[in-house]
């Protein structure tokens, strides 16, 4: 009889970390229904709601990110880090996992560092084309490092690297509706080209400001439709601007899209930040995309993610600082060019790694079973 598996998955902060983590957990349960999985996140962050919604238990750490612009503010962060490591030690001691998995985000650092110090095997998932400081440090003790881009041996020991790709939300491929039905679910016409605008689960200031400034252009181009996810922080000001602009039947605005399968099915082109999780979804679904990387991320990794696609003619890149001047023209010209859309779709499809969650789950189970 197989011994029960006990696995910790740690990370979060944004949907880009949470959705892959849940996909890995689901894949583990599919392979080993007896497995017990405990998530460790950051108190007050998105994962504390989204993980229980997915059916898993989560414990929060009192962790916060470093302020890279105001170093003097990090005294309290260091105190929270020490408290988080102490709490992580208690969690690991009580739960007794055979393996700890880090998916990125505030909580993964103290959790995996503590797990390694306590002799628990660790696996890290590096989503980006440029490894972050935390994962480079955690890699020293990690048993396996799952990556999504070639050339990651410049950051990690080559013998630990496993090319898996990034897991995506599982309902994207299982529940993809027909395009006309998807458009009708957003109160849009089934026979018009449609652009989907997303800025990540928290929203993107530059993209929202650009679209807000372009409401007159959106009204003029009523042969093109727009599905716009603003993020919860920007939703009130965006909806106020939309109301002031008058009737816009070709525009659907929401703070958060729950059914992303429908949003992708409805769209001919996507405007997005360049988070690794989002890019993996675009690859899997063959979606033409205009990427506007966030400049406010560690090591400018989103720009590096975007350029990895641009080098393969698999995406269009607009700098954040140039978005307000260029983004709408680029998007409108691209969505009107069927040949360009086809080229982008074919090239991004070549980069897809469709079974990522299952491959990572198999590696996690292998490590856990080796401990039994």
Swiss-Prot record:
Subcellular location per the Swiss-Prot or TrEMBL entry: Cell inner membrane
InterPro entries assigned: GlcNAc_MurG, Glyco_trans_28_C, GlycoTrans_28_N
Keyword Ribonucleoprotein among record annotations: no
Membrane topology reported for the UniProt record: Peripheral membrane protein
Keyword Cell wall biogenesis/degradation among UniProt keywords: yes
Pathway(s) it belongs to: Cell wall biogenesis; peptidoglycan biosynthesis
GO cellular component terms given for this protein: plasma membrane
BP terms from Gene Ontology: carbohydrate metabolic process; cell division; cell wall organization; lipid glycosylation; peptidoglycan biosynthetic process; regulation of cell shape
One annotated GO molecular function: undecaprenyldiphospho-muramoylpentapeptide beta-N-acetylglucosaminyltransferase activity
Assigned keywords, A-Z: Cell cycle, Cell division, Cell inner membrane, Cell membrane, Cell shape, Cell wall biogenesis/degradation, Glycosyltransferase, Membrane, Peptidoglycan synthesis, Transferase
Residue numbers binding UDP-N-acetyl-alpha-D-glucosamine: 14-16, 128, 169, 201, 257, 302
Superkingdom, natural source: Bacteria
Catalytic activity: di-trans,octa-cis-undecaprenyl diphospho-N-acetyl-alpha-D-muramoyl-L-alanyl-D-glutamyl-meso-2,6-diaminopimeloyl-D-alanyl-D-alanine + UDP-N-acetyl-alpha-D-glucosamine = di-trans,octa-cis-undecaprenyl diphospho-[N-acetyl-alpha-D-glucosaminyl-(1->4)]-N-acetyl-alpha-D-muramoyl-L-alanyl-D-glutamyl-meso-2,6-diaminopimeloyl-D-alanyl-D-alanine + UDP + H(+)
Pfam families: Glyco_tran_28_C, Glyco_transf_28
Purpose of the protein: Cell wall formation. Catalyzes the transfer of a GlcNAc subunit on undecaprenyl-pyrophosphoryl-MurNAc-pentapeptide (lipid intermediate I) to form undecaprenyl-pyrophosphoryl-MurNAc-(pentapeptide)GlcNAc (lipid intermediate II).
Family indicated by similarity: Belongs to the glycosyltransferase 28 family. MurG subfamily.
NCBIfam families, per the entry: murG (TIGR01133)
PANTHER family (UniProt xref): GLYCOSYLTRANSFERASE, UDP-N-ACETYLGLUCOSAMINE--N-ACETYLMURAMYL-(PENTAPEPTIDE) PYROPHOSPHORYL-UNDECAPRENOL N-ACETYLGLUCOSAMINE TRANSFERASE 1
Protein known as: UDP-N-acetylglucosamine--N-acetylmuramyl-(pentapeptide) pyrophosphoryl-undecaprenol N-acetylglucosamine transferase
The species this protein was found in: Bacteroides thetaiotaomicron (strain ATCC 29148 / DSM 2079 / JCM 5827 / CCUG 10774 / NCTC 10582 / VPI-5482 / E50)
Taxonomic lineage of the native organism: Bacteria, Pseudomonadati, Bacteroidota, Bacteroidia, Bacteroidales
């Amino acid at each position: 009889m197989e011994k029960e598996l006990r696995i910790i998955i740690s990370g979060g902060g944004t949907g880009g970390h949470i959705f892959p983590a849940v996909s890995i957990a689901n894949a583990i349960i599919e392979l080993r229904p007896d497995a017990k999985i405990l998530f460790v996140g950051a108190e007050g962050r998105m994962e504390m709601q989204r993980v229980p919604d997915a059916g898993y238990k989560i414990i929060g750490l009192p962790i916060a990110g470093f302020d890279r612009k105001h170093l003097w503010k990090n005294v309290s962060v260091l105190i929270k880090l020490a408290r988080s490591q102490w709490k992580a030690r208690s969690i690991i001691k009580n739960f007794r996992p055979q393996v700890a998995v880090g998916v990125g985000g505030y909580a993964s650092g103290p959790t995996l560092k503590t797990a390694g110090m306590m002799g628990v095997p660790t696996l890290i998932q590096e989503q980006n084309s440029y490894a972050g400081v935390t994962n480079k440090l955690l890699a020293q003790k990690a048993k396996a490092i799952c990556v999504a881009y070639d050339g990651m041996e410049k950051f990690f020991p080559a013998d630990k690297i496993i090319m898996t790709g990034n897991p995506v939300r599982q309902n994207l491929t299982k529940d993809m509706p027909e395009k006309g039905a998807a458009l009708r679910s957003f109160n849009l016409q089934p026979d018009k080209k449609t652009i989907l605008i997303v800025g990540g689960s928290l929203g993107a200031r530059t993209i929202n400001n650009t679209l807000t400034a372009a409401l007159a252009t959106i009204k003029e181009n009523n042969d093109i439709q727009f599905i716009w996810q603003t993020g919860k922080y920007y939703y009130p000001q965006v909806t106020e601007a939309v109301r002031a602009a008058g009737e816009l039947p070709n525009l659907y605005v929401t703070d958060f899209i729950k059914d992303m399968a429908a949003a992708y099915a409805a769209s001919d082109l996507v405007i997005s930040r360049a988070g690794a999780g989002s890019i993996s979804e675009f690859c899997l679904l063959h979606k033409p995309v205009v990427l506007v990387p966030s400049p406010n991320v560690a090591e400018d990794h989103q720009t590096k993610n975007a350029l990895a696609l641009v080098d393969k003619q698999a995406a269009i890149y607009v700098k954040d600082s140039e978005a307000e001047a260029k983004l709408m023209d680029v998007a409108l010209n691209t969505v009107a060019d069927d040949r360009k859309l086809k080229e982008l779709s074919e090239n991004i499809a070549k980069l897809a790694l469709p079974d990522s969650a299952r491959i990572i789950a198999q590696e996690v189970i292998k490590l856990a079973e080796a401990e039994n």
